[in-house]
C-alpha cells in the first residue's frame, strides 16, 4: 500500500491543470483527477487519457448534468436570481454543484486534500473552496496559483508551455483563443485576453450558443411555459406541438430555440467579490427565456408587498451565490423565504421569442388575485370610484404638511 498522501485534483484537461498535475506528482503526492460533466462540450475520453499519461493514478468523470439543472438552475429560476441586474449566474451556480461531486469522490477515494487550477484573482477559487469547506470542514486545499513557489516558477503561459514540453505533457495544436471560456448546459462565459479592454466589442466568432440576430429567422417562435410553485414544469412549442417535461429536456430545448433567435447575450463589467471589476461576456439563451416567463408569472400571481420583499431577498441571494456562499446559514435562511413566496406562482405564460427578445404575450393562472371586473375601466364593479377621493386626501395630507412648512415643491 502506497504511503503517499492522496490528492483529488479538479481537472479540466487544459494546460494549467495538466501542469499542476505533474507538479503535484513531483511533490510526491498520489494524484487522482476529477472531472464533472455539467453539459460542457468536452472530449472526456481524451482528457482522461491525457491525465493518465501525465501520471494520474485514476480519473473520475461524473455526469452531473441532471443534478446541476434540477438542484441549482431550477431553484435559481424559482428564486429569480440575477446578479447586478444582468448576470444569471451560470458559472456561480455550477461551482457548488461541482463541489458536491468533488467532495463525494474525495470521500470515496480517501483523499484528505483537494487541489484546483483557479487563479488568485478570480471568483472561482472562493466558490470552490467555500463550498468544499462547507461540505467537509476537515478537507485541506492546495491552490497552486496562490503558492509563491508555484507562481515564481510559472510566470505565465510560456513557462507552462516550456514545462509541458520538458515533461512530455500533450499540448493542443489548435491555436489558443484570445479569451478564456467556461461552459455548462446553462451558459457559456468568456473573459480575459482581448476582452479585458471594455472599449472593444467582442468579435462575433466568440459566440457559440447563440447566433447573431442579423442571421436569425424572421419568424417568431411561440411557446407556453407552465410553472408550479415557481418551478418550470413543461414547455409547449406552438408550431410543432412538441411538449418537453423533464428539466434537462426543457433547458436543452430552450437553449436551442433561444440560440437560434440570438437570445441571452450579455456583455458587461461586473464587480467581483475580491473588489476588482471584470469584463465578462455571457450566453444564456434557455435560462433567459425561463427568467422572463417566471418574472411575468410572479407579478401576475403574487401580492404586491410579497413581490417587493421577495425581490429584495433575491438580490441578497444572488450576491451570496455569486460570492460563493450557496452553502451558508444566511443563504439557507433566505432560500427558505424565497421558496415560501412561490407557493402561489403557478400557471402558464405564453412567450414570443424573436430576434434577441423574449416577450410575454399572455398568461393564465388559478392562483392570481387579478380581478378583471374590478380592474376594468368599462364598469364600476364593486370598487366605488368615489372611494378614491378619500384615498387621495389621506395620501395628500403628508405632502401638504411638508410643503406648508418647507415651501412649495420646486417646479424645475
Swiss-Prot record:
ATP binds at residues 10-18, 36, 115-123. Keywords: Amino-acid biosynthesis, Arginine biosynthesis, ATP-binding, Ligase, Nucleotide-binding, Urea cycle. GO terms for molecular function: argininosuccinate synthase activity; ATP binding. HAMAP family: Arg_succ_synth_type1. Its EC number is 6.3.4.5. Homotetramer. It catalyses: L-citrulline + L-aspartate + ATP = 2-(N(omega)-L-arginino)succinate + AMP + diphosphate + H(+). Belongs to the argininosuccinate synthase family. Pathway: Amino-acid biosynthesis; L-arginine biosynthesis; L-arginine from L-ornithine and carbamoyl phosphate: step 2/3; Nitrogen metabolism; urea cycle; (N(omega)-L-arginino)succinate from L-aspartate and L-citrulline: step 1/1. One of its GO terms (cellular component) is cytoplasm. L-citrulline binds at residues 87, 92, 123, 127, 180, 189, 270, 282. CDD domains: ASS (cd01999). GO terms for biological process: argininosuccinate metabolic process; L-arginine biosynthetic process; urea cycle. The keyword Nucleotide-binding applies. InterPro entries: Arginosuc_syn_C (IPR048268), Arginosuc_syn_N (IPR048267), Arginosuc_synth (IPR001518), Arginosuc_synth_CS (IPR018223), Arginosuc_synth_type_1_subfam (IPR023434), AS_cat/multimer_dom_body (IPR024074), Rossmann-like_a/b/a_fold (IPR014729). Pfam families: Arginosuc_syn_C, Arginosuc_synth. It is an enzyme of class 6 (ligase). This is Argininosuccinate synthase.
